[in-house]
């Protein structure tokens, strides 16, 4: 039963849900945006160039979790690192929402850095909630994992719809707003 779990699980659940909404929402439209023609608001990259950029981006996100964990352990602590990561992700998505090619790679880089800070540490915070409740840890992580699935579904629908039907930058903007909701919810 959810009521038996620590109250902080709810905060971490919704923070992760909004972060995953922003992450998967942006990822869902990224290659489409890069390969769309300039007349359609895209970057007019070839499929191979867009796929290469996407692959480098995806790999960088996962590699960034290593320094993100180190930064939390040695500099700021997990709670502050999650907050800083969320703010950086939000700005990365909002920069992607600006129709300016020169800002494109900067926005992607911010999302990589922010995700590297947030992702490993929010999971560690969930684990820390159950230091004295080992028997509940598995169900706590199951509940937390549902936030990832829920956020990804929201992201694909919201950012995907806006990106393909209204404009790519609206999809990226929605990802930024989603992360803003996550940051606000985390600090309240």
Feature locations, PLM:
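Short amphipathic helix-loop junctions that connect adjacent transmembrane helices
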Residues: 28-49
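Interfacial helix-cap and linker-helix signal at transmembrane-aqueous boundaries
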Residues: 34-35, 71-73, 158-167
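Central cavity-lining transmembrane alpha-helices of secondary-active solute carriers
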Residues: 51-73, 119, 153
